């Protein structure tokens, strides 16, 4: 393959900025429906490795044989008499942890929000597990036997009416896909044919509801609406897969924005260990445009769905070098914008791959070249997307379906600014894909839709963006603001800068009691992870290079070690985790990776901001605590 020359602005050094959604909103794109009112409760439990040894020694001592069999035995022992199925997405992660996922069933149908995940450590023993299984009364008969449910078309119309979805279904028909699953054919207004699935849903009041799960991809929202199967005007809950917020490019470790770097031409910037086909091939076809195995980038001025036929830069000599200056009008530099977005997303793909987000973990690639997982799911990157302004978002469907990033023009400055050039936006959005695929397993992309779990989704995006943004001379006194360039404001779009100073950033766990919005809650979580980051850097040093250096599978420096442990924690934690459970998962990740050598540094970071050993979750009245385990005092 010919060499590739990109004019790039630098990804991993871009100071990150952004948080998707500068103006926090969960309204259904332009239709005034508040999706927060339909969020599922965070109802999972998690037994960490320490508690399991004390409370479930029989489970903790299980080992030997096939890790799938061991995990299945855990579920049988913990949930005797209950029925369940294993989800076909189990895998052994790069840190040696085996992740196995189960879905509870009732009368042969899924309870769609009842999950069980088991983590087997690299020593072959059960590391931890989490679950949200339903333990209330069971219906005496299968609804299919009684035919005690509505026609799926009524449920589809019920979802459209309740959520004001602009879908025309006057001539729609129902096509049966398999038992309990249908497709609604002949509609218009959605980006693909809507689908329906008959399933149970565990309600907050401890009862079960029989529902039609109606899936509608509306572009800025990709919804799973749980419509009551009898009273089809009632929608119980809604999951949204969309998280709102030689190339001549800005290069410096992903330069944060055009004020912190200069554009330069970079030849063949890919890593063949993480992108063996390069960035401009999928192993079958070699491209001369911004398309490859990991991503496809293009302009999307009208905000539509037909990305394949949209404009993208093309050069038979693979020289993607185009003019750009912040004082130019956005459309005049669209080729530079698409090139920068393509570069940044691919750089993130390669870095996250090194840290463990591989094919079997559910990453985004067309061709998985026999490494596990489901392919055909690169990231669709829409530059200067016309469906909105002053924002960006990322849609994360289950493994095997493409992710979709929409990057908008920001109108807070004149001329307007293109967030393709702010790497923080791209990293933040791509990290939504990471956290949604890892939490609960690659086949379950709806595990971060609760208020606290959704907030952590925003916080992880900020954390990775900030960690990547760190400069060589930074120390723990460095403060970082998100979104200052696109927002045209030194305050950015967060309540406080990320800082280890409680005077500069006073957020603690109980601050979440005041907030009922995911970006605010996410800033609390991101602030805690920033403390973890600097505690580990102070202990292990900081690698300022664009990629980690490993020793026996462990990053040698504190920055990349923190990123690795946080990423491993995502895969360990249960579906719809709380702060407490996610904290425990990170500590368990360190136990597996380093035998717990960083346990106290991690505990001290969380305890500083009120998530110590006595912290307790209650959605309306969280209890903060700064206590440490005895061995860390």
From Swiss-Prot:
Propeptide section residues: 22-245
Annotated positions binding Zn(2+): 428, 432
Residue positions the entry lists as glycosylated: 286, 592, 621
Annotated signal peptide: 1-21
Cofactor(s) named in the record: Zn(2+)
Co-factor note (free text): Binds 1 zinc ion per subunit.
Transmembrane segments: none
Compartment(s) of residence: Secreted
Listed GO CC annotations: extracellular region
Domain of life: Eukaryota
EC numbers: 3.4.24.-
Purpose of the protein: Secreted metalloproteinase probably acting as a virulence factor.
Protein name: Extracellular metalloproteinase 5
Protein species of origin: Arthroderma benhamiae (Trichophyton mentagrophytes)
